[in-house]
């Protein structure tokens, strides 16, 4: 087995498909650094299942895909295929050549193939592990692998030997067994808990099963006794049947008379039906008219309410205007204008005084300056002459230029001051105008707020009215639905599935008058009491005499239609003698209204029955009058020596019919209420829509006013800010001008002084002046003039401020007066418009009230017409129902008379009815046909011995006693009755019996036995798995021990070759535990006493690691080895020694060596040259060294 070829497509730097063909021996791969030699090693490791990106010298696994260059785009996948020659069957697969392919895509997906078939990574690893190539890839010695071997933990070094020895598959088998053991432990604990719990439950359930078994025996005995009693009853009733015959001629005469009466009644019924149809159409039309008028009345009422509220609102809403009188504002404006003129005059006077004070001050300052100059002239005359006239002249020009600059600045500031004052005045005027408009809008806002609140309140009332009517309508509709459902449910209760229903559907014309519930009427509230007294007769059919009843029973029997109760018409009965009812009671006969033909039967059934309130009164009444029967309103019936009642009583047909009638009356009233509420709701919805529109309009007007006021306030803020800014600028500019004027005064004084000095210097002789000037008097006069000038300037400032304060105030007041007049005109116009609107609303309200009055009268008239038509229709329907009942009764009578020709069958039918009831009871309770019952349990059948007697007999026979077999016992009714009671008593003594105990016990016992078997199976399986683990441990121990022994021996030999005279050996860290022990490496090169591997040189470490790998290779050879620059750190001597080992390995394995060393190339059988041009893509060429011939082994 050896590597035949390696194909790379898009793997790392191999952008183009490249195939490297190998042969046995040593193959050297050479090339410059960075050309992609190690990528060949990475490709081999990757295709054989390597999963570590760092092992492949990358950050993530996707880094193996060609990333592209400046001239080549990146690829989307990487693919590597290695082909292995398997002619020696080293791999456990039936192919002489095996190809393994691995692909990776940019999205991280991977694919594996073996000979073109998809497979898993595990399949690849298991295939290679059997040939000594495990997941650790010890056959691939990459860069840094030598250091890793020596620096790894002893346990990691053990993994190299285990992989070479093929221990991995045994460890996988052990791990799999241990995982199964872990899972099995949970199942074993669960099974143990279940069996323990089932064992605990079996004992009490067994006791319950024994009780159930005993109950079955007693129940069988009880069933036998009851069956024999039922068979005796059936035989006795069959002997009671008799036949009665009536005269046929009398029946025929009565039949002809009834037929004539039936024809007359049928014609009358047709006339009633026609008239009722016409009345129904008229009533429906009137009902629709009433509904439309009611809705219109509700809408008119809503319109009246809205118009009344609007008129009241318009009358009460005040029209607000400003509180200021425009004439007063104009008078104030005139007064302010006069004050402004006076202030301007005062300002002119103050300015005139200021000019005089300034002239006086200038004169005094001039005199003072002349005095100073005269005083200083003599002192500085000589100095000034020495300083030179040129410098003084320059200073004079400079100071004059400064004065001119100050004059220009003052002029500009004066212009800016006037502009700022004008802007401030304009902003104040606009502010006052806008402020007046804001006041007007605020006054109008109050009215809009009030109007909006009123419209919202009106809308809320309309919403509440609509919600109230909708809730009432829903309640009424729910009531209608509930009543209809109740009527339907009660009608379902009237649908019978017994003989009564069969007779009604199939035999109604043969003497059957109809159900008793429809033929009789009971006073409201007494239905339950009368139904309790009538019993089954309350649900019975009325038959037209004895013959009709006989015929009906015969038809039932023939058709097997079930059982039915019949009340006989024209039954002879003497009316009871009138007597007062007992105190607190009513006679039952007085509470029922029945047709005359049924009066006899009703009298027979209800005679002597009194109706009382409660059971105590009934018991007391019967105790006082034993001949009477008493019944309570709840249906409890009391007689002499007996009481019947309770709560488990179903409603009779009579009661159900009465309930249907009551529900029908309530349904009609509820439907009328729904119609009234619908009409009212229609009008309320119209009112709600109108008030919704009013509220939305009021809200829109309010929002518009709010927007206008907000805009005005924003404008006020802007104008106020502009006024304040202008005033601040005016004040600031005034201060700047005053400062400049003060500086100008000082500069002018300096200029004057310099000019005087210059003039004195030019004119004054060298001798000083003869006489000084009186300077003190001049200085005092100057100070007085300066004080007067300051006071005059302050007076001008004060006058200017007062004038500015009132400037434009008169114009503002005049504009406010004009605005107030306009507001008053608009208010008057609004007042007149509201008055007109109020008049219109009042007129609408009055007209609406008049229309509402008329509509109410029309609605009332329509209601009366509707009620009259309804009453007439009800009367017509009642009359038609009476005629229909008469027609039905006559039809039944005619049919009954026809069938009554066979009246002799009535007695037999009555007996048959009783027998059928008994047979039905036997069939329902015991599931036996009457014939089988009599044949097996009839009175003629003797009773067999009981199980107890037979058991005693068998025991006596077993004891050898001379006994006779128990003889059958003849039937005896009292004995069977006692037998049945005894069985019932024994069954009651058993208490509560679990009928499913026998089945539950059997099922639980079966489950317990099954789980016990499963538990034993799991224990056995666990024992087998533990045996597998022990077996695998033993196999691992054996394989590892043998491999370690061989590797240890080979390591000593290989170390001696690489280090002649040196000593190296392998040592186990824990020899007592060969399953987990690690492996330490001890190496002592010749002439050195080293105890730690870290003290070895780099070359010595590399040789030591190579020695261990070669020892493993020789002890457990692998088909091929790949080495990546393992000899890079060796000198020539050690390299030759290593090459000698390569030549030894070449004999049994294929070597692929990445190298830069020439000696290594010399021993190679083939050379592969790997290059990389400027495009970053690897290219490969090859050279076969043996035979000095060149073969092309690479396809690119």
Swiss-Prot record:
Binding site for ATP: 32-39
Any one Gene Ontology BP term: DNA replication
One GO location term (cellular component): cytoplasm
Molecular functions (GO terms): ATP binding; ATP hydrolysis activity; DNA binding
Domain SMC hinge residues, every copy: 510-621
Gene3D superfamilies: 1.20.1060.20, 3.30.70.1620, P-loop containing nucleotide triphosphate hydrolases (3.40.50.300)
Source domain of life: Bacteria
Principal place of residence: cytoplasm
SUPFAM superfamilies: P-loop containing nucleoside triphosphate hydrolases (SSF52540), Smc hinge domain (SSF75553)
Protein location: Cytoplasm
Keywords annotated in UniProt: ATP-binding, Coiled coil, Cytoplasm, DNA-binding, Nucleotide-binding
Domain notes from UniProt: Contains large globular domains required for ATP hydrolysis at each terminus and a third globular domain forming a flexible SMC hinge near the middle of the molecule. These domains are separated by coiled-coil structures.
Cited function: Required for chromosome condensation and partitioning.
Family, similarity comment: Belongs to the SMC family.
Name of protein: Chromosome partition protein Smc
Native source organism of the sequence: Mycolicibacterium paratuberculosis (strain ATCC BAA-968 / K-10) (Mycobacterium paratuberculosis)
């Amino acid at each position: 087995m050896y590597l035949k070829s390696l194909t790379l497509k898009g793997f790392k730097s191999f952008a183009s498909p490249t195939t490297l063909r190998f042969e046995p021996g040593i193959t050297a791969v050479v090339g410059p650094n960075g050309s992609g030699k190690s990528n060949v090693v990475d490709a081999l490791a990757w295709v054989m299942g390597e999963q570590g990106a760092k092992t492949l010298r990358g950050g993530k696994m996707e880094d193996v895909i060609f990333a592209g260059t400046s001239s080549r785009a990146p690829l989307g996948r990487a693919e590597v295929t290695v082909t292995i020659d398997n002619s020696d069957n080293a791999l456990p697969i039936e192919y002489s050549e095996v190809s393994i392919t691995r692909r990776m895509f940019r999205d991280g997906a991977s694919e594996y193939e073996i000979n073109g078939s998809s497979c898993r990574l595990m399949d690849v690893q298991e295939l290679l592990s059997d040939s000594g190539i495990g997941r650790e890839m010890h056959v691939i010695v990459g860069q840094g692998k030598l250091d890793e071997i020596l620096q790894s933990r002893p346990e990691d070094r053990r993994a190299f030997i285990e992989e070479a020895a093929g221990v991995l598959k045994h460890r996988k088998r052990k791990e799999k067994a241990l995982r199964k053991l872990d899972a099995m432990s949970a199942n074993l604990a669960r099974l143990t808990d279940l069996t323990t719990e089932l064992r605990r439950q079996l004992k009490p359930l067994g006791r319950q099963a024994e009780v159930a078994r005993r109950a079955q025996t007693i129940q069988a005995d009880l069933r036998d006794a009851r069956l024999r009693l039922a068979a005796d009853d059936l035989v006795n009733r069959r002997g009671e049947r008799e036949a009665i015959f009536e005269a046929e001629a009398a029946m025929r005469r009565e039949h002809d008379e009834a037929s004539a009466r039936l024809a007359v009644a049928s014609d009358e019924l047709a006339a009633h039906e026609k008239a009722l149809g016409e009345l129904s159409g008229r009533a429906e039309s009137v009902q629709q008219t009433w509904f439309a008028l009611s809705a219109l009345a509700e809408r008119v009422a809503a319109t009246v309410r809205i118009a009344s509220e609007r008129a009241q609102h318009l009358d009460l809403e005040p029209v607000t205007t400003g509180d200021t009188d425009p004439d007063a504002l104009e008078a104030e404006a005139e007064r302010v204008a006069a004050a402004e003129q006076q202030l301007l005059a005062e300002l002119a006077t103050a300015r005139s005084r200021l000019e005089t004070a300034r002239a006086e001050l200038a004169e005094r300052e001039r005199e003072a300056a002349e005095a100073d100059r005269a005083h200083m002239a003599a002192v500085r005359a000589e100095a000034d002459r020495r300083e030179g006239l040129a410098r003084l002249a320059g200073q004079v020009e400079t100071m004059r230029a400064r004065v001119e600059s100050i004059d220009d600045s003052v002029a500009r500031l004066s212009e800016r001051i006037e502009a700022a004052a004008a802007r401030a005045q304009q902003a104040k005027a606009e502010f006052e105008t806008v402020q007046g408009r804001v006041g007007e809008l605020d006054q109008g806002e109050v009215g809009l707020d009030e109007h909006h609140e009123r419209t919202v309140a009106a809308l809320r009332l309309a919403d509440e009215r609509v919600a109230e009517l909708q809730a009432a309508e829903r309640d009424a509709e729910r009531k209608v639905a509930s009543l209809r459902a109740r009527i339907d449910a009660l009608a379902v209760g009237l649908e019978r599935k017994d003989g009564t229903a069969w007779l009604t559907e199939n035999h109604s014309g043969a003497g059957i008058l109809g159900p008793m519930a429809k033929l009789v009427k009971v006073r409201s509230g007494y239905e339950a009491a009368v139904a309790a007294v009538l019993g089954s007769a309350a649900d019975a059919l009325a038959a037209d005499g004895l013959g009709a009843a006989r015929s009906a029973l015969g038809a039932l029997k023939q058709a097997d239609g079930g059982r039915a109760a019949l009340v006989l018409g024209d039954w002879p009965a003497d009316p009871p003698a009138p007597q007062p009812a007992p105190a607190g009671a009513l006679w039952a006969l007085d509470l029922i209204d029945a047709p005359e033909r049924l009066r006899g039967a009703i009298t027979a059934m209800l005679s002597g029955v009194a109706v009382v309130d409660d059971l105590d009164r009934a018991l007391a009444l019967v105790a006082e009058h034993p001949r009477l029967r008493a019944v309570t309103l709840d249906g409890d019936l009391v007689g002499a020596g007996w009481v019947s009642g309770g709560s488990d009583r179903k409603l009779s047909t009579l009661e159900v019919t009465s309930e249907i009638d009551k529900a029908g009356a309530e349904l009609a009233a509820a439907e009328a209420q729904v119609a009234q509420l619908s009409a009212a709701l229609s009008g309320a919805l119209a009112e709600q829509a109108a008030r919704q529109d009013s509220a939305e309009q009021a809200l829109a007007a309010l929002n518009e006013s709010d927007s206008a006021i907000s805009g005005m306030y924003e404008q006020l803020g802007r104008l106020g800010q502009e006024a304040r800014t202008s005033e601040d600028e005016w004040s600031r500019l005034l201060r700047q001008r005053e400062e400049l004027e003060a500086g100008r005064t000082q500069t002018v004084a300096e200029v004057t002084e310099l000019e005087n000095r210059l003039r004195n210097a030019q004119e004054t002789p060298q001798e000083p002046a003869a006489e000084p000037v009186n300077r003190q008097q001049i200085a005092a006069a100057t100070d007085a003039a300066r004080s007067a000038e300051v006071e005059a300037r302050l007076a001008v400032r004060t006058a200017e401020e007062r004038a500015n304060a009132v400037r434009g105030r008169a114009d503002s007041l005049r504009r406010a007066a004009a605005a107030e007049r306009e507001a008053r005109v608009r208010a008057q116009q609004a007042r007149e418009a509201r008055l007109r609107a109020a008049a219109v609303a009042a007129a609408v309200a009055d007209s609406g009230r008049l229309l509402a009055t008329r509509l109410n009268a029309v609605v009332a008239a329509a209601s009366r017409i509707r009620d009259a038509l309804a009453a007439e229709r009800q009367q017509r329907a009642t009359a038609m129902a009476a005629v229909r009942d008469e027609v039905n009764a006559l039809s039944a009578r005619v049919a009954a008379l026809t069938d009554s020709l066979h009246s002799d069958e009535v007695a037999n039918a009555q007996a048959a009815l009783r027998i059928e009831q008994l047979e039905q009871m036997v069939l329902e309770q015991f599931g036996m046909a009457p014939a089988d019952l009599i044949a097996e349990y009839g009175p003629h059948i003797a009773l067999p011995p009981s199980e107890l007697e037979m058991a005693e007999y068998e025991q006596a026979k077993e004891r050898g006693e001379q006994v006779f077999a128990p003889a059958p016992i003849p039937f005896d009714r009292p004995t069977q009755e006692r037998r049945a009671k005894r069985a019932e008593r024994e069954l009651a003594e058993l208490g509560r019996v679990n009928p499913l105990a026998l089945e539950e016990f059997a099922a639980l016992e079966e489950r317990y036995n099954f789980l016990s078997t499963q538990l034993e199976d799991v224990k056995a399986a666990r024992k087998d798995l533990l045996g597998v683990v022990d077996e695998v441990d033993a196999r691992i121990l054996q394989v590892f021990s043998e491999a370690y022994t061989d590797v240890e021996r080979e390591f000593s030999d290989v170390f001696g070759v690489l280090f002649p005279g040196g000593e190296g050996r392998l040592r186990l860290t824990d020899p007592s535990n060969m399953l987990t022990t690690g492996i330490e490496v001890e190496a002592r090169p010749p002439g050195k006493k080293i105890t730690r591997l870290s003290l070895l040189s780099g070359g010595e470490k590399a040789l030591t690691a190579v020695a261990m790998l070669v020892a493993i290779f020789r002890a457990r050879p692998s088909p091929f080895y790949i080495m990546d620059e393992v000899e890079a750190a060796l000198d020539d001597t050690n390299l030759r020694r290593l090459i000698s080992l390569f030549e030894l390995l070449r004999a049994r394995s294929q070597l692929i060596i990445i190298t830069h060393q020439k000696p290594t190339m010399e021993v190679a059988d083939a050379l592969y040259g790997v290059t990389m041009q400027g495009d970053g893509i690897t290219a490969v060429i090859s050279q076969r060294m043996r035979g000095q011939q060149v073969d092309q082994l690479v396809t690119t």
